[in-house]
Amino acid sequence: TDTIMPVISHWGNGWHGLDALTNIWNVILGLAVFFLARVLGALYFINNIDDKELTDKCRRAVLNNTVLFLLFFLAFVIRTLVSDGFAVNPDTQEVYMQPFKYFTNFIEMPVVLILFLIGVVLVLFGIGKTVLKKTFDKGIWFTGIGTVLTVLSLLLVAGYNNTAYYPSYTDLQSSLTLANSCSSEFTLKTMAYVSILVPFVLAYIFYAWRSIDRHKITEKEMDEGGHSY
C-alpha cells in the first residue's frame, strides 16, 4: 500500500465490476432505460420538427417503445419492491438484509412515494396523449418532468432511510452508505457554496434550449443547410 495514496478499497474478485452484467435485473433495468430514452427522443422530435410524415413515424415509435419500456420497467420495480434490501442499523452502522426494505422505504417516506406516483402519472400522460391525440406535441414536457421525478424518487428509496445505496456482495459490511461515503466537512461546505451557482446554470440551460427550440425545424430549413439560431 502506498502511504501517499493509500488503497481504501479493492475489488472482491478479478472481474472489476463486470460481473454486474451477469445480474439479469441489471440488464432489465438497462433495457428499461434504453427504451425510455427512445421514447423521449421520439417525443422531442414530435415537439420540435414540423414534418407530418416524420412525426407520424415518431408517434408509432413512441407506442412501440413504450410497450417494451413498461414491460421491463414494471418487472424491475415489482421485483425491487418485493425483494430483500440492504438496511443499515443507525446505531451500529451494521449492514443487514431486510425483507421488503425498498417497499418499506416508500411507506416510511410518503413524500418520496408521492413524487414517484406523480412522476409515473406524468410519464404515462405524456405518452398516452401523444399517441391518442395526433395534434398533441407537448408530450416531451410531461414525460420528461415525470422521468426526472421518478428517477429521483427511486434514488432516494435506494439510499435514504438507513439504506446501503451501493451494496457489496462479497463483504456486506463494506457496502457504501451515505454515512460512510460522504466527503469531509470542508468539502461539503465548499460544495454548499458552489451549489449557489446552480440556479444560474439552470437559467443558462433554459435560455440555451429555448433559443434552439423557439421555432420548429422544417424540411425547407434542412434543405437550405447552414446554421440558424
Language-model regions, residue ranges each:
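Short, highly charged, low-complexity non-transmembrane loops/tails of multi-pass membrane proteins
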Residues: 214-229
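Short, membrane-exposed interhelical loops at transmembrane-helix boundaries
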Residues: 95-100, 166-188
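Hydrophobic alpha-helical transmembrane segments of integral membrane proteins
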Residues: 112, 119, 146, 190-192
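Long, contiguous internal "core" modules enriched in hydrophobic/ aromatic residues
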Residues: 1-139, 153, 157
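Substrate-recognition/cap regions that form aromatic- and gly/pro-loop-enriched pockets
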Residues: 135, 157-163, 175, 182, ...
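Juxtamembrane non-transmembrane "cap" segments at the membrane-aqueous interface
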Residues: 2-4, 152-173
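Alpha-helical transmembrane segments of multi-pass membrane proteins predominantly involved
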Residues: 125, 129, 183-217
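Central hydrophobic cores of alpha-helical transmembrane segments
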Residues: 140-149
